[in-house]
Structures are given as C-alpha cells and as structure tokens.
From Swiss-Prot:
Substrate binds at residues 137-139, 261-266. This is Leucine aminopeptidase 2-1. It is an enzyme of class 3 (hydrolase). Zn(2+) binds at residues 290, 294, 313. Its cofactor is Zn(2+). CDD domains: M1_LTA4H. It comes from Meyerozyma guilliermondii (strain ATCC 6260 / CBS 566 / DSM 6381 / JCM 1539 / NBRC 10279 / NRRL Y-324). GO terms for biological process: peptide catabolic process; proteolysis. Pfam families: Leuk-A4-hydro_C, Peptidase_M1, Peptidase_M1_N. Its EC number is 3.4.11.-, 3.3.2.10. GO terms for molecular function: aminopeptidase activity; epoxide hydrolase activity; metallopeptidase activity; zinc ion binding. GO terms for cellular component: cytosol; nucleus. Belongs to the peptidase M1 family. The keyword Ribosomal protein does not apply.
Length: 615
C-alpha cells in the first residue's frame, strides 16, 4: 500500500524558503574569490513570477553575511533569522506599491569561515604546491551557505554564472570565455541549486574525447588524460543508447587535489572526481559511468526532495551498471551488483539502531533533520535493486522501452516516488497484475535489506570466493605450497577487491589473521603486485588485511599512505584501524598529515576516535 501525500510532488521539508509561491525563470550568479581571506562574495539575481501574490520572499541561507537586497532595482528591507539545523531564513519584503508579478530579486552576500559549501586549500595541501585552491560541494543543502537561494531540488532553472579569481576557474556550465580574471559560464538546462559548483586554482585541461576534457593540476595532467581518454566517449555512447542523446553538450571531468574527501560529484558539464580514480590501470574509471549516468538521473530528472533521494541515486546506479553491461557484458554488470549488495548489508549493519529510520527507501525528514544525516548506501543499492527487480519481472527488452519514456516525461522536472510509480503503471498498463506482485510497502517503507534478492550471475565472484576459501583452509593447516602469482593474474581490480574483502571478513569470525602471520607473509611474497598496486581500492584493502593481522611492518605503510589520500572512504576507516592496533602511531600520522585533510574529514576522524573511546 502506498502512503501517498495529498499533492505530488510533495513539498520539500528541507528548505526554509517559500519556493512554492514563485516560479523561477532564471538565475544570474556572480562570484568573486578572495584567497587572502578565504571568502567568496556573491551577487545573485533571481528572475521570478510571484504566482500567489505573496508579500515577501523567503530564501535559504547558512552562515552568510547579507549585505543588501533589492527587488526590481529598489532597495528592500530584509531580515536574517537565527540559525537552526537547516540554516537561516532570509526574509525580503516586497514593496506594497509593487503590483506586478514579474520580479527580479537581487541579493549581495559574502561567505564566512563556517561556510559548509566551500573548501579552501593552502598551496601545501595541493599536489603541485603552486598556489591555493578552492572547490565547492553543495549537495545536499550547502548551496545556501554559498549564496541565498531557494535551496531545494524542487526548484530548477537556467543559470548564467561568473567567477572572478586570480587563478583559472571552472563552474557547472558551458564556458563562455575569460575577461581578465573573470570566467563566464552558461547553463541553459534547468538545474537545482545543489548542482551549482565552482573550483579555482592551478588548473589546466587536456582533451579525452570529442566532447570531453579533463581538468586538473598540471602535475597530473598527462596521467589523468591517459586514464580517461580510452573510455570516456564509449561511456557516453553506451549511456545514450540506453536513454537518449546527451543534452549537456560537453562532459568534462575535474580531478581535484588529493585532499578532496569525496568520491565524486555530478556537477553538470564538469563532474568533480576524487584523484583516487587515477590508478594507472584504468580499472577505476568505471566510477565515471556513475557520474555520467547522473546527467539523466538526478540532473535532468531530479528528486523533488531528499526524502526521495533514491530516485536520483537508485536510477543512477541502475544505469551505471547497464552501461557496464553494454561495454563489458552482463556478468560484469551482475558482479558490480553483487558487490553493491554486500556493501548494502555492511552499511545497514553499521547503522545499528538508526537502521530503523535510515534504511528505508523513502525517508521522512519532516522533523527538520539534516538530509546529510540520512546519507548512506541505501538509496543507491536498495533503489537500484528495486529497479533491477522490476526489470526482471517485466523483462529487459520491455523495460528498456520504459527508460527513455520515463526520462522524457520528467525531463527538466522534479518528482516524488509516487509519480514514478504512476508513470510505471501507466506505461505498463497491460502488466498491472505483474506490478501488483511487488511488495511496495516493504520496498519503500520497511527498514532493512530488500524483500527480494535478484538472481545474480555469480561467475565472476565465485573465483574470488574460491581462492579466499583456499587460503582460509590452508592457513589452518599452515601449508602454502599450492599458491602462486598465477592465482590472481586474470583478476580485475574489482575481483581483487572482493577477494581481499572476503579474506578480511574471515577475521570477524572465530578465525583471526593475527594467529596466522605466516599466511599473511606468504601472501605478500606470492602476490607482490598488491604491495606495489597504484589502485587505491586494492591497496587500501591489502593494507587493511595486513594490519588486521597485526603484521607490524604494514602499520607505518598504512600511516604514510593515509597522508597521500584525502578521501574519507579510506581515511576514516584507515585511522580507526591504525588506532586499534597502535594508538600512538595513529595519532602521530594524523598530526603529521591533518593539514592536508578537508575540515569535514578531520572532524569525522576525531568523532570516530571519540566513539571508540566511549565504547
């Protein structure tokens, strides 16, 4: 049974604005970067229609200093409310004599030290060390700390943007040109505020396809170009064959400095990605398939609120794996899904009691909770598994016809779960009885794992499990003569990830690797390529396995490596593990490298340690 709201799409509870009173036609956003003060000033103009004849405009803000506000060129009084979890309301009075409904609302503001959307890096925290660097991350509700706005995915409009900076700059739009230190961009496709992005620093670019370039610090330009140029256009063409023509003109990627704490962000026209994708073996570039898929799911068709985040991420993971299937075969698609299923199990288990709230597909944020609190693997993996299940019931050939229909229907729009389901039932009217077999109540509202597990092709994962089991049983006997480097010679990086994850998981049972150091040392001798790997996903797990087994020579190796990455996926569990085996060493390396980390990353590591101390 569906718990339908009275109106769809339902209102976004994570904005303080009165966005429902206005139609936003266009936004002009002009930014200026001050690297001396680590501040960004903004002038934003919203062209709107006052559809309800309201007497005030209420915008979202957070940690901003508001300098002025005007409507249709007339200076207007404004009020900034006290900050709460979701920020501070900015209320601008519409002059009573202003009877027209077409308004241009202009606000000048400046960020503060507490801005959650921006990260300023000193030169020493960049890879090249030439100068400072700035990048933004506005998802989910951090755009309001960069400029006042209707900060909700329910509001989408075209943008004209500029940034003035002493260093080369990019934004989430099509480059229009440079005038002195001013870089101008246009985004004609309607986007929500969370997709506004800016980066500025020692940035160069190189082509990686007929409609793609990679941007990064000059020091890494050649290796980044090599990593992406063989696959980028293939990804684009595979995605277009699934949905429809790519609408954003260019698909570029910005590889950020090592201190970037995230995996990637699907900013339109220029995806921001972690440098840990650059492995030298092109094994991690499949991550680009995910960010590219966002060009349709999330960017073109958007969840109306963060309660329905699975519509963005579930669809994106589904499309990502379909792209991989087209390029590498269905066994690869299912292999990725199996890894995702395991990640989902681990994620829900790690939630503890909070899984009762945060492991359901449709969230309830109506109590004013921060959407970041709800962030997990659930919308990605549980959402994509639901779509896989629907595809299985309907049949892939028939479901493939629904994909472009869905994205055409909601193109440029924001929707909720119920509109998706209505669209599904409308398109498959002849399959109503089949769709009715889906336990929508459990899929959407019940916590825990999905009610149905697809019948995945396990051929690629079976090899990993079999080798791991072999090591387990031979470790018990202390006999290792049957292993050689040939065991893993044909493994992809992801297969090595599964193999190592399986070995690590054994330690959670009665078996403990610290009692089998001979096995770990033999493994290091036989599989020498793991210690030499440039693939962050593989190398991290290799270190985790060895340190979990109290192989002390790897403690300092892990500690030094944590100084070369800033991605929280590795940094947080890396320090937690090091802290468990040698707290003084963990503190030493954190003190040595903490200035290289993002502020959020530093605070999360400290929080992790506090949790450990209070257990």
């Amino acid at each position: 049974m569906l718990r339908r709201p009275k109106v769809s799409p339902e209102l976004d509870p994570s904005t303080l604005s009165n966005y429902g009173d206005f139609i936003v036609h266009k936004t002009q956003l002009d930014l200026a970067v001050d690297f001396d003060k680590n501040r960004v000033s903004s002038c934003v103009s919203l062209n709107v229609t006052n559809r309800t004849n309201t007497h005030q405009v209420v915008l979202d803000s957070s940690y901003l200093v508001i300098h002025s506000a005007s409507i249709n060129g007339i200076s207007t009084p404004f009020d900034v409310a006290e900050r709460q979890t979701l920020g501070s309301k900015v209320t601008i009075k519409i002059p009573p004599e202003m009877k027209i409904s077409e308004l241009t609302i202009t606000i000048e503001s400046e960020t503060t030290y507490e801005c959650t959307a921006l990260q300023f890096l000193p030169a020493e925290a960049t890879d090249g060390g030439v100068g400072p660097y700035l990048f933004s991350q506005c998802q989910a509700i951090h755009a309001r700390s960069l400029f006042p706005c209707f900060d909700t995915p329910a509001v989408k409009c075209p943008y004209e943007m500029s940034v003035t900076s002493p260093y080369p700059s990019v934004m989430s739009g099509r480059p229009l040109g440079v005038s002195g230190n001013m870089y101008r961009f246009s985004q004609p496709v309607p986007i929500p505020s969370y997709l506004v992005a800016v980066a500025s620093g020692d940035i160069k670019s190189a082509p990686i396809g007929p409609r793609s370039s990679v941007y990064c610090e000059p020091l890494k330009l050649e290796v980044c170009q090599h990593e992406f140029q063989a696959d980028m256009e293939h990804f684009l063409q595979a995605a277009e064959s699934l949905v429809f023509k790519y609408e954003w003109e260019r698909y570029d990627a910005l590889v950020l400095p090592s201190s970037f704490p995230y995996g990637g962000m699907e900013n339109p026209n220029i995806t921001f990605v972690t440098p840990t994708l650059i492995s030298g073996d092109r094994e991690n570039v499949d991550v680009i398939a995910h960010e590219l898929a966002h060009s349709w799911s999330g960017n073109l068709v958007t969840n109306c609120s963060w309660e329905h985040f699975w519509l963005n991420e579930g669809w994106t993971v589904y499309l990502e794996r379909r792209i991989l299937g087209k390029l590498h075969g269905n066994a690869t698609r299912d292999f990725s899904a199996i890894i995702g299923w395991t990640d989902l199990e681990n994620s829900i288990a790690a939630m503890g009691p909070s899984a009762e709230r945060w492991s359901m597909l449709v969230h309830n944020l109506k109590d004013g909770s921060d959407p970041d609190d709800a962030f997990s693997t659930v919308p990605y993996e549980k959402g994509s598994t639901l779509l896989y299940h629907i595809e299985t019931l309907i049949g892939q050939e028939k479901f493939d016809k629904f994909i472009p229909h869905y994205f055409h229907t909601f193109r440029y729009k924001s929707l909720d779960t119920y509109q998706f389901i209505d669209c599904l039932y409308s398109f498959f009217a002849d399959f109503k009885s089949v769709l009715d077999t889906i336990d929508w109540e459990s899929w959407l509202y019940k916590p825990g794992m999905p009610p149905v597990k697809p019948d995945f092709d396990t051929s690629m994962v079976d090899q990993c499990y079999q080798l791991a089991d072999k090591w387990y049983h031979h470790s018990l006997k202390n006999k290792f003569h049957k292993f050689s480097s040939e065991d893993i010679k044909s493994f992809t990086a992801n297969q090595s990830v599964v193999f190592l994850d399986t070995l690590i998981a054994f330690d959670k049972l009665d078996f403990k690797w610290k009692h089998h150091l001979d096995a770990l040392n033999t493994m290091a001798s036989v599989y020498q390529e793991y210690s030499k790997s440039t693939n962050a996903e593989v190398l991290f797990r290799w270190y985790v396995l060895q340190v979990t087994g109290h192989n002390q020579e790897y403690y300092s190796r892990l500690g030094e490596w944590l100084g070369t990455v800033g991605r929280m996926k590795f940094v947080r569990p890396g320090y937690v593990l090091l802290n468990k085996v040698d707290r003084s060493m963990a503190l030493h390396y954190f003190e040595k490298f903490h200035n290289r980390y993002h502020a959020i990353c530093k605070s999360m590591v400290r929080r992790d340690w506090d949790l450990i101390k209070t257990k």
